[in-house]
């Protein structure tokens, strides 16, 4: 019998997710000295308006318009922090980095392993009766989507492999909800107010184990306007309007990752793990 992924139950997966980014905790010193924002208006239209500290973003799309935000991880080095404390401008040479298995209590190590199993969570506030909210996650250059119709609450989950399923959600018209879209263990899931939204069939996009073990991230540096799925810009939030304007605010935005398993043969210097 071929090997299969041992998938975590929803409540276990939620408990094990690790925070990569939280918009509620900006770094004012970096912002003041020109460090790039983790979230960028990807269509370069200016439709997303950030609150001053970039804890939340608001957009109003006219009929037929769309607005997209994308996340990129810009990781300041110790030298960057030194320059910031000296009042020097930083950020012009900042480059997006992969999400890795960094742990704060192992801070001597910056994390050596790319993690493609990600989740995006936010408080979604709708001031409109219709429109569409689309979340996407990139994993090894494969882009997975969750599209929520504000008119009737139907969520459509679409894996890059073509597997599709629908879920009925309480997200309808005007209101506020906590939404989380996850791609963990090669399975897509949607949670609203911490409750899983069941689909008729699981959205599994199984990769073969032997291929999964050698799959690499896509390292193309992309900029606003690009449609290339890159692991250097792995999370997106898009608002689409059809026949009427749509006004939406997203706040408390978090990017999360699954824990990362490695086979280790021992330890080197403190905080360092050697892989098999």
Stretches with model-predicted labels:
Residues 1-276:
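Extended hydrophobic leader/signal-anchor segments used for secretion and membrane insertion
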